[in-house]
Amino acid sequence: APIYNVGEVKDNQAFVIEADDESCPVDLKLEYMFGKPPKTVLTDISEKSNFDDLYFEDSKFNEYLTDVLRLEAVACKDWLTNKVDRSVTGKVAMQQCTGPIQLPLNNLGIMALDYQGKKGIATAIGHSPVNALINAEAGSRIAIAESLTNLVWAPIKGKLSAVSLSANWMWPAKNKGENARLYRAVEAVSKFAIELGINIPTGKDSLSMTQKYPDGNVVYAPGTVIISAVGEVADINNAISPRIQTKLGSKLVYIDFSSHSLELGGSSLGQVINRLGKKTPDVSDAKYFANAFNTLQKLITDGEILAGHDISSGGLVTTLLEMNFSNTEFGMSIDISDFNEDLITVMFNENPAVVVQVNDTTKLEKELKAKGINFKIIGSVIEPRMISITKDSKNIKLDVDRLRDIWFESSYILDQKQSGPQYAHCRYKNYRRQELSFDFPSHFSGKAKDFGINLSRRERSGIKAAIIREKGVNGDREMAYAMHLAGFDVKDVHMTDLINGREDLSDISFIVFVGGFSNSDVLGSAKGWAGAFLYNEKAKKALDSFYARNDTLSLGVCNGCQLMTELGLIYPEHPEKPKMLHNDSHKFESGFVNLDINENKSVMLANLSGSRLATWIAHGEGKFSFPYFHDQYNIVMKYSYDVYPGNPNGSDWSTAAICSNDGRHLAMMPHLERAFFPWQWPYYPEDRKDDEVSPWIEAFVNAKKWV
């Protein structure tokens, strides 16, 4: 898109337009347009806080750890992430969840810019409200630091200087001492960002964070700034996950980003023992921080980093545990004897820092020493499923799986409020039992050319297909690209085109009803969309004529599956059609689930028979309910696990997809069009890193071959 430099900002309080001949047709003082209102002057008194320092005992390490892992800021956020669509657009390269049991542990999110290239946009957040209670300036700097130690795991084009921040101020302003604290916090953020060499071009504020009650009680929210950091990703395939790679003997390295003494003030540990503390973590040297950020970026770009995680809420011990939680095997041997501080301070401090996993420390040590970055080699990956922590003569052994259940428990308690006790308990009981596993077809090479796919195709193939859209759907673009990749020339057909007669589908051999929320699901899933076909003569005629032909294929995904079921398009010979009911959990479900493809004669899925794959689900009404016995249906795909959440909706016989008796018409709830590239999978077989496409692309290639 064209971009033009049309002017510059000055401090002359005037709006000036200069012509090419150096004349000045417009030269207005801003006061002529906006008046000259008086400047607002806020007067406040600085209040000096005096919080109790922390007192702790090494002997209570396990007690402290259990309480910290249950703290909402530290505990599992599964109850939040499982109810929002994390795959829509098909451009999600990294979302919250990672690993074979898909736990929400990722440091950042990444959206691909398109389906062909490697570039993307990364975003991460940081906040530090408890630190800011003690020290508004330090807490605000820590918020920026946390956002950046989360963002650093994506290879940012231009490194730190190319990052932009957004600042969202949440503050109980206009209360005694709070305006003064806010002023100091804003000033600290401004200076820190300038010293880092990054900009804050946008943000917002909510300065009424005070709750007053009829009995006279007043509650202040802790003043904090929530920082969102954004940067362009050079290669989405090189982003680093916190999940430890199962490489025995690989090393774990602690890298300091703060250049500051280790402090426990404002920490999660302080909260669980009901003390704030006097001294908080801080970043002593912005240039040092920037240097550490850019050095780690280089190591990531050079392929030296296997896994990595920031240290923030919960401290170093939480970081180490979380790096193990999303796996089901292996552990760590950790030795922190090189730290001068005591065991509790080392393991629970939240100073800005990271832990990385590397195969060989040689290059990492050389780079960090050359740049003057403080680091310590603290351990290695071991086979026993535990974390062994040594500090001088002390040794503590942590049961990773037991502590993971404790960490997940808070999510389970909160989930009861939305899924109900039964299904919240099912999720809590089964999350660790429903590990993702794969059995790819033996013929699948992962190479695009082996399927006749030209990844950069521009010319027409002459084989027409159509996306059928209704207002509210949102899965059309990823579906269109999957079809295009397979070799179709894809036409965009909206329901208004069919209703008005502009399209009649006579030149189309393959139609796809896409996913989303047609008509906002106001009438129920796809009920309004079905009505648009049933009660509009031209649309109904076009649909009936299409299905009367013997040379046609159709696919319905998610909302499209609900539509095909509502219209009875899969089994028109049945007097009573299947129904799509609300999920048994009574809420929207989003997840990456295992699927077994049964032996079948479906045009699109036949040569994937016997496979175990995985893809995204995102629906609120995905439960197949069948009026007849099992043998009356061609159930081509099932959820690999019969119980929730592996079967996310409670479908009869764990059904995920059905097809017509002749194999030409397929309806499925999972989104195969959001997983045709390996980078779209949040967990892909580790021995298939060279794959260009995933097995799901074969469904579209099969459709093209048949047509």
Language model regions located:
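Short, well-ordered, mixed-charge alpha-helical segments that flank or form enzyme active sites
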Residues: 13-15, 208-210, 236, 562-566, ...
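Amide-donor transfer/coupling interface in amidating biosynthetic enzymes
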Residues: 378, 501-503, 544-545, 578-707
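Cysteine-nucleophile active-site neighborhood
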Residues: 517-602
